[in-house]
Each structure stands twice: as C-alpha cells, then as structure tokens.
C-alpha cells in the first residue's frame, strides 16, 4: 500500500551494495517470490490464492529448518465478483473499472454522471442527487471523506479517475474500518475518466449503468511469524505485508517485501543474535492494516526495541526513524559504521498508511527506508501489470544487504532499550507531521 515519495530514479542510478554476505539469501528470496507470483497470482486477503500462497511460504521456511507460526485472526473481508460500469450515452461502451474494496452489492441502476471535481462539498454542482459522481485524481481527501460527502449529496456511485495513464486502474481499500460503503466506488482509467469529463464540460449528457456484485464478507486469515531467539528477549520486529490486490501478481506491492523478509530469515537462521528477531508477514494490509493491527495488539507488554517495516522498499538511499527522535542516534551510528554510506543518511519523517502505523499506535517505535523504485515498475502497483518481470533480482539483492545490516545494527546496538510511547507522545507523533487529519479520517486514530 505504500506510496513512495520518490519513484523517478532509474534503476541504474540506485545505490548498489556490491557483492555481500547476504547475496545467496537474497537470491533465494527472489527465487521464492518468482514461484509465489507465478503459482498463485494475486494474494487478495481471504482468497484461496492467498491461503495457498501463505501455506507455501510456511513450507519453504520449514524446509530451511525454521518454525513458522500461523497467527490466525478474523477481519472484515471483501470478495471481488463481476462488476461493471457501462456507458449508455452518448455512446454505448463498457468502461474499464475496478471496484474499491467494501463496495457492496446493489440492484443494477442507470444514472447520469456529474463532475464533482476533487470531491469537496464546494465542488458539487446543484442537482447531483441520484447521479454518479466523477472524481478527480487530484483529490486530497481520504476515501471515507469523499464517500461521506457523496452520501450527503445523494450520489449513487463514484467513478475515481486514476492518476496514471495507459489504461491503468488503482485498486485500493474503500474503508479502514471494514464497514460496507454506502455507495459503490470504482477506479476508472485516466483516459476514460478524462473523456467523460470533457463531454460533461461541453454540456453533453453522460449516462451509465452500474452493476456491483462484489461483496463484504468476514474472513479468517493469518499472519506468518518466524522467531529467531537471541540472548536477550528484547526484540526487533521486521515485517511487511504478504497480501496484495488481485488484478496482478503483487510483485512490487508487496512481493518485494515478502522476498526481503524471506531472505532475512534465510540469512539469520543459524546466526547468533544479541536480541530476538521476529519476522512477520502480515495479511490484510491492503484492506486496512488488519494483520499488523492484530499483531501489535497481541504483543502485549513484550519488550520491543523497534519495528522495521518493509513495504515497497527498493534499494535504500536513507533510513527513516519515522518521527521518533529517540531512534535517530542509533540510526546515525548505523550510518557512521557503514563503509558505503547511504546517500541521504538518516531521515526522520513520519507518514501513515502502512503496517508501521499499527505499531506506532501501540506506542512502538518504527523504522523504514527511503528506497526509490524505478517509475516504470512502480507505476503498475495495484494493477494488472504488477508482475514479477517488473522486479529485477538485483533490487532484492542490493536492498537486502542494506536492510540486513540495519536490522543487525538494531539487534546489536547496546545504546538501545525497549521503549513505548504514551498516548500523548503518540498523538504528537501524528500531529507534528501533519498526518493527524488523515489518521482521523481513516478511523485509525485517536484510540483513546
């Protein structure tokens, strides 16, 4: 689910770690991901493909002598079925769309389309009730905010224009709370969305027929956990989400993280560790961080140094303390000890919407990386073309070398102690970086 701040660096320009002790493990992780993508396709949480793929992961980890544990939980799920939006006038045309999750079945209906701009109340024209809203790709509102305003104005559906050209869609969650949406929301290609917008701007009536059969359904799923015991029970948690959207193979988002975690487990399985390392493949991240929310909850009072989140992490150019000032000195020690420095060193900028957020809400410090992925690969995330051929082995090899070094730095640093923020400090973590409004809009926060 991660949206990267920098995605335009060509692969050739990304930092290379060179040949390292981690290479064989990284190549094993990449090979595993290739089998996972080609054997099972997309890993939508709750689907048969997701379950079978997770079982395969457990089998291959067990073959390495590890003891993976299924951490089972129930969550509000969603099942994609056959949905359609058909233009009836001025032309008859089946539009390329994909429903956002938590869109629910309804009787087919026909309605005119109205341009609602960026989805704010002030953008609505008069007479929108009973129509289908065309939403700009440039909206800064959370989906929950867009839907609430649309409901107040009596819309029957929303067509959300994709930000990428080339006939792409952007599947995404419609709700972080797991509640069924009061009206269906569809991603529509940029080309067809802009076309409809031009027709409306000329005063042409655009009428569509909407059919939604996808449905909300509770699902039982699981995270997969590997614990590598250290001399101390203090733990460093390293996690990334296992699930993906269903249109493609989920190779970039987040098969990349799946491979990096596999490589880490492969590399550390026989290594003496000062602290315990807990490696977690989370399920249900794309629907609303459900797996990491469960994992953070069942941690209880376990002593945790930090959580490291691997969500679409290319080759790191910086390591990020995600707003926790107390982590910065340790990360600076990691950077100082590197023979090849990370070009942008240590950053300390918080953002929300991936699994680290769940741990931050539990008061646990989190770390991730500034790690750009080539635009010609990352542009396809959440769509049909997010496939293994977009991910060169070299990215997994070079990124794993840096990630593994960073994890071991956290494991071995004597200056670190387990730490939990209190609720006020957590509130400040979100407000200080201006993400408090978005956190509230998703329903993830406040928790007290």
Language model segments and positions:
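N-terminal hydrophobic or amphipathic helices/low-complexity stretches enriched
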Residues: 11-65, 227-229, 436-448
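Second-shell loop/turn segments in exported
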Residues: 17-23, 38-48, 113-116, 134-141, ...
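N-terminal capping segment at the start of a domain
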Residues: 17-47, 71-73, 169-174, 178, ...
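Noncatalytic luminal/extracellular "stalk/propeptide" segments of secretory-pathway proteins
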Residues: 23, 34, 38-132, 141
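Alpha-helical metal-binding/catalytic segments enriched in His/Glu/Asp
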Residues: 61-62, 137, 150, 158, ...
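Metal-dependent peptidase/peptidase-like ectodomains
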Residues: 62, 185, 231-233, 246, ...
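Soluble metallo-hydrolase cores and metallopeptidase-like ectodomains found primarily
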Residues: 91-124, 175-251, 263-266, 274-276
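His/Asp/Glu-rich mid-to-C-terminal helical/loop segments that flank catalytic regions of hydrolases
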Residues: 266, 377-448
């Amino acid at each position: 689910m991660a949206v990267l701040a920098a995605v335009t660096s060509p692969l050739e320009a990304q930092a290379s770690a060179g040949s390292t002790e981690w290479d064989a493990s990284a190549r094993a992780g990449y090979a595993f991901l290739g089998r996972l993508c080609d054997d099972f396709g997309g890993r939508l949480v709750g689907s048969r493909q997701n379950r079978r793929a997770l079982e395969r992961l457990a089998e291959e980890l067990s073959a390495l002598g590890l003891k993976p544990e299924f951490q089972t939980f129930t969550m509000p799920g969603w099942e994609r079925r056959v949905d359609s939006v058909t233009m009836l006038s001025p032309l008859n045309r089946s539009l390329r769309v994909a429903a956002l999750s938590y869109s629910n079945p309804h009787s087919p209906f026909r309605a005119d389309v109205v341009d609602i701009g960026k989805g704010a109340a002030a953008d609505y024209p008069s007479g929108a009730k009973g129509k289908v809203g065309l939403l700009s790709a440039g909206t800064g509102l959370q989906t929950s905010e867009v839907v609430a305003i649309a409901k107040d104005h009596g819309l029957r559906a929303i067509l959300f224009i994709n930000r990428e050209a080339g006939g792409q869609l952007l599947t995404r969650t419609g709700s972080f709370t797991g509640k069924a949406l009061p009206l269906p929301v569809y991603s529509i290609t940029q080309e067809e969305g802009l076309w409809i917008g031009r027709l409306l701007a000329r005063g042409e009536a655009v009428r569509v027929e909407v059919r939604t059969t996808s449905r909300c359904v509770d699902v039982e799923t699981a995270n997969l956990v590997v614990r590598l015991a250290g001399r101390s029970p203090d733990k460093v948690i390293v996690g990334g989400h296992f699930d993906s959207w269903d249109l493609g193979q989920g190779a970039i988002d987040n098969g990349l993280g799946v491979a990096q975690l596999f490589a880490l487990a492969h590399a550390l399985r026989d290594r003496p560790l000062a602290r315990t390392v807990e490696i977690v493949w989370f399920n249900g991240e794309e629907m609303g961080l459900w797996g990491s929310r469960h994992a953070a909850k069942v941690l209880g009072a376990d002593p945790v140094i930090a959580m490291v989140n691997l969500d679409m992490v290319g080759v790191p150019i910086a390591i990020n303390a995600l707003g926790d000032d107390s982590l910065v000195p340790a990360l600076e020690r990691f950077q100082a000890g590197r023979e090849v420095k990370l070009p942008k060193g240590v950053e300390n900028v918080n953002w929300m919407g991936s699994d680290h957020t769940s741990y931050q809400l539990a008061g646990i410090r989190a770390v991730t990386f500034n790690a750009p992925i080539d635009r010609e690969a990352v542009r396809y995330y959440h769509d049909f073309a997010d496939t293994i051929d977009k991910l060169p082995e070299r990215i997994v090899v070079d990124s794993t070398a840096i990630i593994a070094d960073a994890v071991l730095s956290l494991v071995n640093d004597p200056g670190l102690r387990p730490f939990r923020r209190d609720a006020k400090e957590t509130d400040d973590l979100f407000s200080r970086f201006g993400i408090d409004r978005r956190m509230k809009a998703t329903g993830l926060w406040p928790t007290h």
